């Protein structure tokens, strides 16, 4: 029997067995380099160490830093600090190799691993914060190793073992910013947060004052536990799904409420960390609005409805995160603000009956109008927070109106022509949310004088349309138009409630009033044009530039352009022609600027 084929297969198998460890290390080195650089593509050198050599490198550095420096009683603290600083570069390089890092961590003694932040500080190093960051990176890499040396199992057991507040603080300080696996971060944070769920009233301070100052970390272990998971969505959701078990059985909203209540009576760091975890667990930083994962959306629903119950009592340091959360869930905010579909409906994960269809709106859940208003109040007190929300809503407003205009226009060109009215419904949803935001800002700020003055200045100073804080002039105009909608809601609300006497906001608008109205008309008209909604006669060539309608700043600078636009718009309205361009324009303006939702929101304040 011919055996040459079998011999060849055996040769290939032997080669494969030799190559697999190298291939695995190439993969892990690439993953580590990608984590450190944040780049989409990474370039790494060839594998220069075998697995055995990587383990030896890690063990040698562990001996150097452990018994050689940190635990060496023959050296003064000052000399230890000099040695740590001298060799820290080797440690930073080690973080790029998970296998070598794992050998390093496994080679340290348990007391060194468990008390490293304190031990580093005791060396007297003037660069303790940077030194701890280097150690954290190595520990994170070690915990990501797929085939760690046996000693790593002991460290894993140490991390999972219950301990006192001081030791827990040391563990958390070392893992903060380490990039350790989600399950490790969650498990370590829960050692503190599980006890917190059982007895939130006890003293949660660990570590020492000099450690807080040296490392820039909070002394409150609850705060530090939240900071450790605050950038990892999987870890956040894991903690809030299990915190307190056993023996304390709580729902996720109850866990959130417990921490919000704690944050309201502690320093700003607690609320800041809690707000960040709410945003991270909701997928704010790693998912797209309108396309959130089921896990992130379910978390966000609980975060938003729980926060809404606090309203303007939300701690100030968490309000920025609430604005980011609202911006990321703009689809849900518009759906929740709809008052025509039932201002007294409850919040839920499924669509309520008879909810109007807004094309392009893809909410993952459905807030009640009252819940939407309550959540808006969690961040509306500060202009910088509403700016965050308004920038996102300006973009969404543009996209939804253009899509609705396109669908209505296509239907009108069908046979038989029939306008489904998506544009009006979409404009109404946008107007409802803008009105509620205005009411929330008015309630939390006490007055809107500063906002009004800003809006008046912008519409009378066309240079402001560039809006340097926006990523581009076009995005700046979209942001401005959203805020002008709020401005218009306030104007209409005054007229609604006060009959527009001489001393109201409306009467003080002077020349800005006409410009504001014209800006709204022009913007809505451009959305109809972008969507291809039919107009007869078509958009005038004199109002075009580079194949598009003139940008908004052009008519604001030249009133004659507005006159030409208004005359053309009026000419598109022919009695008996059904959904003409001008009629569609009027309905769009009426929808986007309405005081009804603001009046409804004010009514919620009167409820017990």
Q: Language model features by range: what are they?
A:
Residues 1-59:
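N-terminal secretion-targeting helices of virulence/extracellular proteins
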Residues 2, 97, 181, 232, ...:
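Helix N-terminus capping/helix-initiation residues
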Residues 3-7, 212-220, 453, 457:
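Short, solvent-exposed segments of well-ordered alpha helices
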Residues 28-38, 42, 247, 403, ...:
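Charge-rich, low-complexity amphipathic helices
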Residues 268-608:
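Long, contiguous all-alpha helical interaction modules
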């Amino acid at each position: 029997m011919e055996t040459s084929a079998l011999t060849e297969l055996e040769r290939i198998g032997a080669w494969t067995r030799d190559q697999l460890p190298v291939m695995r290390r190439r993969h892990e080195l690439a993953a580590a380099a990608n984590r450190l650089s944040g780049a989409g593509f990474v370039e790494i050198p060839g594998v220069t160490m075998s697995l055995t050599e990587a383990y030896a490198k890690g063990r040698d550095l562990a001996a150097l830093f452990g018994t050689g420096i940190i635990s060496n009683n023959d050296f003064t603290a000052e000399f230890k600090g000099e040695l740590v600083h001298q060799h820290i570069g080797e440690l930073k390089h080690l973080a790029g190799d998970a296998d070598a890092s794992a050998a390093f961590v496994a080679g340290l003694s348990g007391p060194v691993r468990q008390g490293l932040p304190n031990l580093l500080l005791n060396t007297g190093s003037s660069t303790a914060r940077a030194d701890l960051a280097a150690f954290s990176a190595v520990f994170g890499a070690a915990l990501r190793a797929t085939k760690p040396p046996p000693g790593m199992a002991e460290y894993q057991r140490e991390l999972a073992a219950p301990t006192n507040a001081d030791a827990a603080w040391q563990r958390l300080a070392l893992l903060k910013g380490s990039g350790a696996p989600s399950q490790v971060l969650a498990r370590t944070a829960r050692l503190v947060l599980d006890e917190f769920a059982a007895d939130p009233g006890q003293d949660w301070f660990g570590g020492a004052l000099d450690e807080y100052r040296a490392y820039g970390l909070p002394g409150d272990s609850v705060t530090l536990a939240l900071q450790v998971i605050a950038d990892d969505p999987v870890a956040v959701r894991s903690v809030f799904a299990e915190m307190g078990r056993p023996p304390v059985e709580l729902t996720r909203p109850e866990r959130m409420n417990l921490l919000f209540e704690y944050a309201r009576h502690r320093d700003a760091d607690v609320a800041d960390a809690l707000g960040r975890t709410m945003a991270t667990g909701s997928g704010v930083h790693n998912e797209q609005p309108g396309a959130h994962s089921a896990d992130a959306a379910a978390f966000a629903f609980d975060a938003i409805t729980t926060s809404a119950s606090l309203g303007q009592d939300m701690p100030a340091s968490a309000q920025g995160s609430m604005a980011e959360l609202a911006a990321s869930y703009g689809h849900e905010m518009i759906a929740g603000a709809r008052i025509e579909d039932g201002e007294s409906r409850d919040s839920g994960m499924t669509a309520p009956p008879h909810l109007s269809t807004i094309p392009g709106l893809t909410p993952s859940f459905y807030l009640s109008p009252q819940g939407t208003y309550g959540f808006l109040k969690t961040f509306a007190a500060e202009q910088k927070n509403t700016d965050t929300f308004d920038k996102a809503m300006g973009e969404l407003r543009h996209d939804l109106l253009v899509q609705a205009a396109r669908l209505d226009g296509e239907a009108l060109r069908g046979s038989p022509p029939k306008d489904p009215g998506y544009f009006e419904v979409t404009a109404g949803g946008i107007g409802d949310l803008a009105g509620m935001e205005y009411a929330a800002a008015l309630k939390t700020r006490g007055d809107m004088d500063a906002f009004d003055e800003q809006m008046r200045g912008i519409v009378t100073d066309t240079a402001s349309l560039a809006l340097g804080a926006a990523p581009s002039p076009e995005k700046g105009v979209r942001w401005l138009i959203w805020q002008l909608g709020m401005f218009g809601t306030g104007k209409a609300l005054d007229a609604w409630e006060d009959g527009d006497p001489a001393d109201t906001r409306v009467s003080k608008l002077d020349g800005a009033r006409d410009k504001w109205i014209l800006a709204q008309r022009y913007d809505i008209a451009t959305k109809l044009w972008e969507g291809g909604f039919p107009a007869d006669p078509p958009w005038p060539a004199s109002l075009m530039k580079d194949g598009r309608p003139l940008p908004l700043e052009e008519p604001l600078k030249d009133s004659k352009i507005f006159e030409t636009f208004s005359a053309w718009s009026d000419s598109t309205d022919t009695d008996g022609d059904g959904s003409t361009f001008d009629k569609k324009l009027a309905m769009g303006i009426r929808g986007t600027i309405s005081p009804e939702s603001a009046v409804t929101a004010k009514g919620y304040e009167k409820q017990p």
